[in-house]
Amino acid sequence: MNQFVSELTALVAEASLAPSVHNTQPTRWRLAADGSILVLEDTLRRLKIGDPTGRDADVSHGAAIEGFALAASCRGFGVAVEPLLGPSLAELRPVARLSLVTGQTPDELARPARLRRTYRGAFAPARTGTALDPLERADDVVLLRKASDIAQIAALNDAASLRLYRHAPFRAELLSWMRLSRGDPRWSIDGLNAEAMEMSRLEAAGASIVLARGVFETLDRIGVAGPLIAEAPVVRSAKAIALFHRPEAETPLETGRRFYRFWLEIAALGLSASPMAVLADDPLAASEIRQSFGLPLDRRLITAFRLGLAPRHPTGPKPRLPLDTLLVA
């Protein structure tokens, strides 16, 4: 049993590398008496304003489950997933039951899991050559390479972000997950720290002021809030935009699994990426993207990744919760 617990701990450590909305890391793991693994949601980490239905949390759980399955494959195990429905108990909501099965060969996407990072800065001007070509073959991706298309996405992203930021409760919730100073005790644990957002100390200090209630509204009235939060120059530095879409009827768990795999496919090509989820969350932006780029009506836009080559510079470890928090009794 001790060996199995040790193995489970190693699998959870690998699974924790998966992305989650705002890096909230809502997924918890419990070893059941029958040897299966229960996947649970820490409901205290739900984004009550940004994700009231819990869809983004479930996509995050799906990514974590895929990370677990990738790690298990390297140990010769496959993973059977049984979605669970049920009420929360002590702030933990049942999500899925995982059962390990033998005979699995290592998944080739397991290795890029340690390479994958979100890069939110301007991409290097270096050419990507044919590196993007394999992404064209995915049936759930529309790849935009024309400068005019990338510029259109950049403008849509800024407009959608401004509409969303005008919602003060959303901004307050976002700020609560932003770690804008290295003095924040949660800098290396969770949320979005300034380093991960490619912010200088000055930019991080400015963000804490600009996004504050009252200040943002005043800046918006005089027409400067939009330019201050604009990302268009950064987005236009991308070599391509990948519109990632999935079937409307697909469960968020399945969407999350494929979302993580696609991001790992990007990393395996030596590319960096940053998702622009606001383009899917904002109805006006999502509608224009559907019309402009021919997304079928039975498909849901999940996000738009900006893709390119990140400049080489040292980065700290990914902010992650300790394993004794992720594994629950």
Located regions from the model:
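Acidic, surface-exposed loops and disordered segments
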Residues: M1-A329
